[in-house]
Amino acid sequence: QQRPSDRYEKYFKQDVAPWKKGKKILVLPPTNAIANFFNVEDWLDQTIKTLKQNTDRVIDVREKPYNPTIETDHVGATVKVDRPTVHKAKINWHDYHATVTYNSNTMVASLTNGVPVFCDPQNSAAAPISETNFSKIETPKYGDRIALFSSLAYNNWTLEEMANGTAWSMLNES
């Protein structure tokens, strides 16, 4: 939904880098909990397969630092099982041609740093300005980032706005 940029400019404004033309692809898979919730446990395997069929670029996969495995116990309850992940250094956005993610919030950092996003069409906030067909990895969309950030800003509120009804009012406008 189109929103004015006032909230973005007041609360979230930051420098937005020009679009970059890096060489590699950054893949940010959903956490195990998200993959389980959305029933996309095969997302990473399918995504890598699609990317390899459509590009010869280097693909870096970066898991979230804390990503416990979700399992079902003997009575059928969902439980988490801690599993170590490799925490890589800070992302060097200059290296990347695109970020591919299911619905990671890191897409905001990617877009802010000038790296276009490929994402899930239904479950990612970046979908309105990003390519959702991963087979088009060589032709990213370069959408209006400020419009997206402005829309996202209208879904974040201060404690005062939650207490005084502003948040509720904005939610009911949508």
What are these regions (language model features)?
Residues K24-I25, R57-I59, V117, I146-L152:
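Hydrophobic anchor at the start of a short beta-strand
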Residues T78-K88, F118, E131-E138:
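Short acidic-hydrophobic, aromatic-tinged amphipathic segments that line or gate anion-handling sites
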Residues T50-Q53, S110, S124-A127:
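Glycine-rich loops and low-complexity Gly/Arg-rich segments
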Residues K13-Q14, D45, T85-K88:
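A generic local structural motif
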Residues K20-E71:
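Conserved catalytic-core segment of nucleotide-activated headgroup transferases in glycan assembly
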Residues D60-N113:
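Donor nucleotide-activated moiety binding/catalytic core segment of transferases
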Residues Q1-G22, N36-F38, P128-S174:
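Leloir-type glycosyltransferase catalytic cores
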Residues N103-M107, V117-S130:
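Short glycine/proline-centered loop/turn elements that form peptide/ligand docking sites
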